[in-house]
């Protein structure tokens, strides 16, 4: 197939954005690269079908919620379509000091946020690892199946206590409102009650103990931990990072920017939320719907390696879509494709699972250094191997193909949600995007933003995508402010 034919039929290929890598490649290696890269290409027709399937699945999820609110039945819809229970959006005029716990990956943050009432926030925060906590000997730290719920939430409480002490907030008898970003699938009967359905991203805390997290209210677990540690704080809202992104964008977007109706996460995990115009019809208490789209499974353009990845994962046959687009998996997809292309030329470390992470892939994609020194450094660090020029070429082409596919599916997701909202037909609105894949990877960000017009055509100008400023941390604190102030806040229409 000629380069013209590829560009015409493949939405993941654009000559302008293809990595420039002027290294001569022998014919056999070139054939092997194309053999595997072709498994990752997505045609325009495939992406259009993906968007249609996604829109249809959204409608199925809404209908399922109308029949049985807060009960997810997987065979009815792959989306959980959860109620955020958030009825109001911030105006940018909220003031005060609020705290947030941001938990959605292997690290978590304790956040102190001061809102100035003019759409600006001063944030102080501490970041902590949950995998390498010295007090526990579990293989995966506090994310291990042998770690208990009490151990995990006591750790959160102690970190909040520390940052409150740094600002003398422990001496104040006033109970501080805390927003809790808990970025895992939950059912929420109310804004301050959120029951974990199941762990994702390979986390397993409590599964092998009598003190699990799954099936329990994480808000109560957190408040009980505050009581045990004698901390003057109380969780007033639980949300996920996607909802937090929407709330953060709404508060900080600035005057003149259209309203924010979509929040998207593209980081360690992936998810989205949106304003549902017909929320009453489908029996939602809130107007922002948490989609939980990682489990989407309708005619996905999978490769053989995706199926192998799924087979060896902790949650086999679940979250397949997330495994194709999220940062938690992209590095491992790159590694497996590299092993298939290089075969006997691989170092011993290249055969080790998860030895190459998504951050390293981002370095490769954004590498403009002389002789691609940055790419060589991350390859050496990951695999203890000095790459030849040809091998660097392979690495760059594989990274491009893997991340291209992720960006194509992500923009298909955004386009599908925009079509569901229908506001795009007649007016402008904003989509806030957070997560390291988008915010910290300029190459990926460009791919995502430039090509929405492929799907939305002349309506693309009505959708404004902006990077969210710490949706999961600031967004939780902003939501806590909205609830705690109990002000007369304009509601979404």
Swiss-Prot record:
Residue ranges of region Hexokinase small subdomain? 91-239
Q: Which UniProt keywords apply?
A: ATP-binding, Glycolysis, Kinase, Nucleotide-binding, Transferase
Q: Name one GO biological process term.
A: glycolytic process
Its biological function?
Catalyzes the phosphorylation of various hexoses to hexose 6-phosphate.
Q: Does the keyword Ligase apply?
A: no
Provide a GO CC annotation, any one: mitochondrion
Q: Where does ATP bind?
A: 102-107
Q: Which GO terms describe its molecular function?
A: ATP binding; D-glucose binding; fructokinase activity; glucokinase activity; mannokinase activity
> What family does the entry list?
Belongs to the hexokinase family.
Annotated region described as Glucose-binding, given as residue ranges: 177-203
Pathway recorded for this protein: Carbohydrate metabolism; hexose metabolism; Carbohydrate degradation; glycolysis; D-glyceraldehyde 3-phosphate and glycerone phosphate from D-glucose: step 1/4
Query: Catalytic activity, per the record?
Result: a D-hexose + ATP = a D-hexose 6-phosphate + ADP + H(+); D-mannose + ATP = D-mannose 6-phosphate + ADP + H(+); D-fructose + ATP = D-fructose 6-phosphate + ADP + H(+); D-glucose + ATP = D-glucose 6-phosphate + ADP + H(+)
* Hexokinase domain residues: 27-481
| CDD domains per the UniProt record, alphabetical | ASKHA_NBD_HK
Do you know which SUPFAM superfamilies this protein is assigned to? Actin-like ATPase domain
- Name this protein carries in UniProt: Hexokinase
- The gene for this chain is HK
Q: Where is this region: Hexokinase large subdomain?
A: 240-470
Specify the superkingdom. Answer: Eukaryota
Q: Kind of enzyme, top EC level?
A: transferase
Report the EC number(s), separated by commas if there are several: 2.7.1.1
Q: Which InterPro entries match?
A: ATPase_NBD, Hexokinase, Hexokinase_BS, Hexokinase_C, Hexokinase_N
One Pfam entry name: Hexokinase_1
Keyword presence, Transmembrane: no
